[in-house]
Amino acid sequence: MDSMTLFIASLAVSCIGALASVLLIKADNAAKTAGCLIGAVAAVLSFVAGIQAVLGDVTSVDTIVFFPFAHFQLLLNQLSGLFVALISVLAFAGSIYGLNYFDEYPGKKGRAGFFFNTFVASMMLVITADNVFWFLVAFELMSLTSYFLVVIEENENSIHGGWLYFVIAHVGFVLIMASFLTMTNFAGGSFAFADFRATQFSPAVASVCFVLAFFGFGAKAGIIPLHGWLPKAHPEAPSNVSALMSGGMIKIGIFGILKVGLDLLSASGVQVWWGLMVMVFGAISSVLGVAFALQEHDIKRLLAYHSVENIGIILLGVGASMAAMALNSVGIAVLALMAALYHTFNHAMFKGELFLGAGALLYSTGTRNMEKMGGLFRRMPATAIYFLVGALAISAIPPFNGFVSEWFTYQSLFNAAMQGDKAVMIVAVFAAVALAITGALAVTCFVKAYGVSFASAPRSEAAANAKEVPAPMVFAQGLLAAICVVLGIGAPVIAPVLVDVAASVLHPYGGVFAAEGMELMNQYSGAATSTPAIAIALVVLVGLACGYRKLKTVGKVQKSQPWACGYAPNEHMPVVATTFASEVSWFMQPLYTLRDRCTAVCWSIAHFFQKLTGVAEAVEPVPDKVLVDAPHKGVEKLADLATKLEGGNYSIYICYIVAALVVFLVLAVQMG
C-alpha cells in the first residue's frame, strides 16, 4: 500500500474517532476511550505513511472537492513525510496518555476526544496540502480546534490564555494569507502550489512574500516577539495536548517557513539576507526563551518558554542553510538544513516527554508550582526517570538526541562563517555564541527544575502523598523517552536519512545532491555520530563508579538527619526554585518585571528572619509586558469607553446613526 493511501486512511480513522467521541458524548468514559483508542490507530497509520514518504515513496492526489477553482491537492513528499511521522508519534503517545489523563475533565471527555482527533487531522492536512485554499482552510481548522482544547477548563486563566492564542494565531493567519495571495496574483491567479514553484518572482516580490510568511508562520512557531501566547496557552491545555502543541503544532510554523522560502519560491532563488534575518531572530529567541524559563516556578510555563528557545535553535540551522544556499555552498546548506530537521524531530520527542511528565506531576500533586513539590523521585520513580531522560536530552547531554542535533548546528554555523561573506560571518559567529549561552542556561534551568521537583523532601502535603500515575500515562512517557535515546545513539543511521530529506528540499536550486551534504557531514560529524561509543563509555564508567562506591562504603555508612545549625530539619529548608536561579536572575534583571509578590515564601531557619523576608514569587518578562499586556489593556480601555458611549438609551443610538450618515454623505459629496 502506497504512502498516500495509508495517509488518507489515517485521516478517515481520525474522523471516525472524532465522530465516535461526539456520538458517545453522554457516556463520558466510553467517549474518552473510543476517541483515544481510535486516535492511536490513526496515528499508527499516518506514522507508517510518513516513514514511507521519508524513504522515497513520494505520492500526491489531485481531485475536485466542492470548489472547481480550488482542487483538493495533497502532496506527501520527503519533507512533509518527516513532519507527518513527527506528529504521529506525539498523537499516539497523547492518545494513550489521554486514556487516564482526560479523567481530569469530567463531563468534557467526549469534547476532548472530538477536538483532539480533529486537531491531529487538521495538522496532517496543513502539512500535505498543495493548494492555497485547502492549506488555509486546514490551518484555520488547526487553530480553532487547538483553541477549544486550550479553553476546555473554562476558567479565567484558560479563557485568557486561549483568547491571546486565538488573536495571535489569526494575526499570523492574515500574514500567511497575504503572502499566498501575493504569490497567486503573480502566478496568473492560480491557487496551486505547483504553479508557484514554476513561477520566477522578482526579487522584491519574493522578499515581500517571504517576510510576510516568516512572521505569519513565526507567530505559530512562537518566535520572539510573537511568543506571548505560549506561556499563557500551553499551561492551560490538557498536558497531552500541550505536548502535541509544543512538540507538533509549533513545528508547522517551521514547516511553513521552509515551504515558502525553499520550496514555493524556489524558482526565484533564496537571498542572503533572508538567512541572516532568520538567524538573528533564532539567536534572540533561543537566548531570551531560556532566560525567561529560568525564572519560572510553574513547570508548564517553564517548558513553554523552552519551546521558544528550541524554535530559535531550529531557526539557526534554517537561516544558515538559506545563507549558504545563496552563497552557492550547497554542502553547508544541506548540513545546516539537516541539523534543523534533526533538532525539529528531537525537540518534538523530548518536549513531548517533558510535557507528559509535567502532566503526571500535576495529576499526582494537583499543582504546577515546583515550589510545592519535592521528594517525588521516591514516590513517582518511573516518571522521575523518564523526566530525567527528557531533561538530559533538552540540555544537549550526550548520548541523548539533543546533543546530536545541536552539534550539527554548531558545525553548520562554523562552516557558514568561513564562506567569505562578512555579513554571514558576523551573524553566524553571533549565532554560535548565542547557542553556547543557551546551552549553559538550559543545563542550569533543568538542574533547577529536576532537583526542585524530584529531589530533597516534599514541600507540601500533596507532594508527600503523591503516587505514580496509571500505566498508560507511564507507557506514553517511556515511549518518548526511549525515542530520545534511539535518536541519539542511532545518529549514524538517522543522520544520512535526514541529509537525503534536506537535499530533496534544496534540490530545486540546482544540482544539490545528498552526496555533497553527506561528505561534509562525515567530515564534521565527529562526536555527533559517535554517540553509540559515548553511550557505552558512560554506562561502563557509571557502573565502575557505582561498584567502587559500593565496595568502599560496605558497613561504613550510617544514615542520619542533615545538620541544620542546631534546628530540626523541616520541609522549608531545602533550596527552592526562587533561590536556585537567584544569581542568574540578578544578572538578567533588566529582562524581568514582577508579576506578583508575596511575603514569607522564602523560608529561613530562624522565625525572626522568616518574618523579615519577602521575595518575588513570580516575574514577567519585559517583552511580554510590552507586547502582550500593554495592547491587551489598551483594548480593554477602548471597550470600557465603548460601553460608556452605549448608555442603553435608544435616542443616543439614533443620534449615532444620523451622525454616521452625515459623515458618509459629506465624504461622498467631496469624492464626487
Named regions from a protein language model:
Residues M1-A9, I16-F114, F186-Q200, D500, ...:
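Transmembrane helix-loop-helix hairpins at membrane boundaries of multipass inner-membrane proteins
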Residues L37-G50, H170-A178, F387-P399, A476-V499, ...:
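Hydrophobic alpha-helical membrane-insertion segments
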Residues T59-P68, A192-A198, F408-G420, I494-Y524:
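Membrane-interfacial helical/loop segments at transmembrane boundaries in membrane proteins
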Residues L74-S88, P203-F217, A423-G439, A515-V542:
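Hydrophobic alpha-helical transmembrane segments
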Residues A93-G110, F116-F135, T145-E468:
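Hydrophobic transmembrane alpha-helices and their helix-loop junctions in integral membrane proteins
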